């Protein structure tokens, strides 16, 4: 843990500006792009399959986000996922809305089988992915899925599928955030309730992880960094603002500012049940 914290402190500033290919939903597209820019990366937001052959030769990592799914978006995600598997491109799959429709479930499972580096979602989405029940409606997580016993069940279920998803890092976000890889797990507990009140915070976590994968960071460390960085940024933003729109803007502002001082990482809260 101590060595990982030292590594997390040293990640920013990035030593190079990686090119990050994002196939994401158009609702949060600008937020995702700005998150990558503020970290020091360069986003390219392309879902046109005609460009993939060229882009896969020049980009450093790939973000696949299932939000606002339609037939064209599904085709882009599916093709990019297969290409990423063939080319061993570092990839984050964000299972937005997994399990709420057959289309999302089939697509999410297909992308998961293509050996992504990281699979993420909120606790309810990841519960459905491993076959556990969830009371969540739509793309928002259910509070009942975030109780201690529910998280214990989720961690156990994720560890049980590691033979099928060897080395893949699973990230489940919520009031407590869970990271699982093979037989190890971690629970983080920073953050504020206001993060659930504006669209795109989960997408931002995916963007941060992908940016760090693009500069060669270890996916386990990158996932810890991404969750903690956003949550600590939100804690700082809440202390400086009143009103949700001001809070939303300040979170993005803190994505830019927070990493200029390595001491932000001393605020990371590791948790048990």
UniProtKB/Swiss-Prot annotation:
GO molecular function, one term: magnesium ion binding
Entry keyword annotation includes Kinase: yes
Listed pathway(s): Cofactor biosynthesis; thiamine diphosphate biosynthesis; 4-methyl-5-(2-phosphoethyl)-thiazole from 5-(2-hydroxyethyl)-4-methylthiazole: step 1/1
Pfam families documented for this protein: HK
Chain ranges passing through the membrane: none
A GO biological process held by the record: thiamine diphosphate biosynthetic process
EC number annotated for this UniProt entry: 2.7.1.50
Reaction catalysed by this enzyme: 5-(2-hydroxyethyl)-4-methylthiazole + ATP = 4-methyl-5-(2-phosphooxyethyl)-thiazole + ADP + H(+)
Binding site for substrate: 45, 200
Known cofactor(s): Mg(2+)
Sorted UniProt keywords: ATP-binding, Kinase, Magnesium, Metal-binding, Nucleotide-binding, Thiamine biosynthesis, Transferase
Binding site for ATP: 120, 173
Family that this chain belongs to: Belongs to the Thz kinase family.
Function: Catalyzes the phosphorylation of the hydroxyl group of 4-methyl-5-beta-hydroxyethylthiazole (THZ).
This protein's name: Hydroxyethylthiazole kinase 2
Gene name, Swiss-Prot/TrEMBL: thiM2
């Amino acid at each position: 843990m101590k060595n990982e914290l030292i590594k997390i402190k040293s990640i920013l500033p990035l030593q190079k500006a990686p090119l990050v290919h994002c196939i994401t939903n158009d609702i949060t597209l600008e937020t995702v792009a700005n998150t990558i820019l503020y970290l020091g990366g360069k986003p390219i937001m392309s879902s046109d399959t005609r460009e993939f052959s060229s882009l896969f030769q020049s980009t450093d990592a790939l973000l696949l986000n299932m939000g606002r799914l339609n037939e064209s978006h599904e085709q882009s995600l599916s093709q990019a996922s297969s290409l990423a598997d063939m080319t061993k491109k570092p990839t984050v799959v964000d299972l937005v809305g997994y399990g709420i429709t057959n289309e999302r479930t089939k697509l999410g499972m297909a992308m998961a089988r293509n050996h992504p580096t990281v699979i993420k979602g909120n606790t309810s989405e990841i519960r459905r992915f491993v076959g556990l029940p969830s009371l969540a409606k739509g793309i928002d997580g259910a509070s009942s899925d975030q109780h201690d016993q529910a998280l214990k069940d989720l961690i156990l279920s994720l560890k049980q599928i590691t033979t099928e998803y060897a080395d893949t890092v699973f990230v489940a976000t919520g009031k407590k955030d869970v990271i699982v890889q093979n037989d190890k797990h971690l629970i983080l507990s920073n953050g504020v309730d206001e993060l659930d009140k504006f669209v795109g915070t989960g997408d931002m976590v995916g963007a941060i992880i992908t940016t760090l994968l693009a500069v060669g960071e270890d996916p386990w460390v990158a996932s810890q960094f991404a969750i903690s960085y956003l949550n600590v940024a939100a804690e700082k933003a809440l202390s400086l603002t009143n009103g949700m729109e001001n809070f939303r803007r300040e979170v993005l502002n803190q994505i830019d500012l927070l990493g200029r001082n390595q001491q932000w990482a001393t605020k990371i809260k590791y948790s048990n049940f």
